[in-house]
């Protein structure tokens, strides 16, 4: 899985439930802070934070150990089963990931990050694209703070994988309205227009990816192929040279060496 498609949001919200609108005068209420945590919940939260950091660093096995420790300390620690699902997902343990996603969803049915990540899992690894797209549409209704474009992008990628180019274009375009510079969104739109042989539009999107200083082997190879179709030899050579220099062991570089321009 490409790094942009695996870049998941790991934001969790601690929210108090059952707040009374008008509490009785004799009672006092206060905002819950770290000082209100029990020793057990505090230790579990620390373990979960470590698990999140390991997962973000690409150390899924270590992250899994830490989240298991967190659950052993406090099975109710918020977000634990979501993190466990992501760790199993990264390790390719599909059934275990699905079970953890379900457990997380049973306690957080309206968590935008969770709906987005589970929907993407069902599309990309779970073999249930229809269910995944339905869940991504739910995530669109309750987007996570700071990442509302993600479910639109993931829905578009899933639709494209299913051959629905028109639906994919609509979803991905909605994502660009929210975040015009998202590399995965722009890469996928470039791929979509390349499939349609609309090379000029494909170029406009791949330039947003390759021109921002952090291209991938996939984006450079696609860009070189688009440039070749447009007869732009200078740009084709520039991106091909970057591909060779920056990603000498990538499958895309091997395809370049074979001259597989039309694969």
Report the location of each language-model feature.
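Structural marker of alpha-solenoid helical repeat scaffolds
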Residues: 39, 73, 107-108, 142-144, ...
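Residue-level recognition of tetratricopeptide repeat
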Residues: 43, 77, 111, 146-148, ...
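TPR alpha-solenoid repeat register
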Residues: 80, 114, 149-151, 185, ...
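N-terminal leader/linker segments that initiate helical-solenoid repeat arrays
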Residues: 19-68, 72-74, 256-263
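Structural signature of tandem alpha-helical TPR/SEL1-like repeats
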Residues: 58-65, 91-103, 127-138, 162-174, ...
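Terminal, low-structured helical/coil segments at or just beyond the last alpha-helical repeat
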Residues: 23-35, 211-263
């Amino acid at each position: 899985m490409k790094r942009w498609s695996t870049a998941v949001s790991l934001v969790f919200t601690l929210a108090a439930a059952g707040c009374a609108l008008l509490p009785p005068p004799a009672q006092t209420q206060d905002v819950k802070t770290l000082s209100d945590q029990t020793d057990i919940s505090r230790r579990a939260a620390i373990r979960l934070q470590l698990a999140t950091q390991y997962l973000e660093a690409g150390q899924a096995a270590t992250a899994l150990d830490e989240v298991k420790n967190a659950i052993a300390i406090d099975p109710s620690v918020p977000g634990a089963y979501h993190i466990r699902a992501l760790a199993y997902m990264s390790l390719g343990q599909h059934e275990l990931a699905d079970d953890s996603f379900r457990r997380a969803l049973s306690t957080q049915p309206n968590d935008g990050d969770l709906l987005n990540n589970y929907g993407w899992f069902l599309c990309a690894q779970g073999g249930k694209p229809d269910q995944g797209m339905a869940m991504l549409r739910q995530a669109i209704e309750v987007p996570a703070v700071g990442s509302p474009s993600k479910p639109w992008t993931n829905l578009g990628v899933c639709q494209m994988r299913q051959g629905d180019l028109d639906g994919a274009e609509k979803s991905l375009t909605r994502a660009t309205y929210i975040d015009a510079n998202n590399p995965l969104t722009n890469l996928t739109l470039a791929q979509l227009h390349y499939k349609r042989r609309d090379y000029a539009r494909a170029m406009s999107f791949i330039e947003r990816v390759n021109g921002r200083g952090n291209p991938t082997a996939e984006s450079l190879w696609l860009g070189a192929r688009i440039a070749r179709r447009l007869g732009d030899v200078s740009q084709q050579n520039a991106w091909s040279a970057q591909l060779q220099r920056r990603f000498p062991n990538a499958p895309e570089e091997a395809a370049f060496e074979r001259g597989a321009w039309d694969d």
